[in-house]
């Protein structure tokens, strides 16, 4: 039968704990202390027997970036010289990757209480988002939005570069904030700044500036909407900072909206193990921008 491996992350030099829930059928059952967890090389994982058929594993992060399979094995009841595999999971060892992000309140956009929620999402993938919030009001000159008074959104906003109107918005706001070239910025717009189509936000891949729209219509939009502001902001940071793509663009449209992953269009917030791999891709460089595309 097919067996789907679960994935667990642990930071290099740190400790993580995993609870294994033991389910057994039949009359001949194993004592919990006869179940051994070990690496492929045979190194045993320290465990603690707990109540409710639970074994707690103590996992140590030991590598900069590596993954290994941890096996749960039991002795064969018919041949005690043999071991049987009862289960397994993949353990990912990763080194923390810190990055600086500023949430900017524009025309009253609410950024209060978002930093902790956004940072928590990425910490599970061993990435630290150092979030600064600029709560002082930054007022956009609405004249830059043109005759329709809305921010022009093109197709596939997370993939393309900034258009001329978006560059004008960036240029206007950069002059009104404490801008630092070595930080990423997400502009969180108040209700008077709307896009030309329903969209939760956008941040082109590996670009410095992201845009998030706070109205209920846009937070629940079919495109880039996550239903909650913190999740939408994290989704856009995933695109702009870490070059994460939508899972349905990678694995097929039939899964769109059907996963609990951050980069899907449903309301999930989980980073899957392939996202972890991208977060820690050594070719992924931070704060590398092209001036003409970032509104300079």
Model-based region annotation:
Residues 104-107, 132-134, 187-193, 214-217, ...:
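Active-site-proximal beta-strand/loop segments in catalytic clefts of secreted hydrolases
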Residues 176-182, 201-206, 254-257:
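Extracellular/periplasmic catalytic domains that process cell-envelope and extracellular macromolecules
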Residues 37, 70-72, 118, 211-212, ...:
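Generic low-polarity alpha-helical segments
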Residues 216-296:
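The catalytic-center signature of Zn2+-dependent metalloproteases
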Residues 190-227:
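Active-site scaffold of zinc-dependent metalloenzymes
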Residues 119-131, 204-215, 237-238:
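Structural alpha-beta junctions
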Residues 101, 184, 210, 261:
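A broad, low-specificity signal marking well-ordered, structured residues that form hydrophobic/aromatic
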Residues 1-182, 190-196, 228-229:
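Propeptide-to-catalytic entry region of secreted or membrane-anchored zinc metalloproteases
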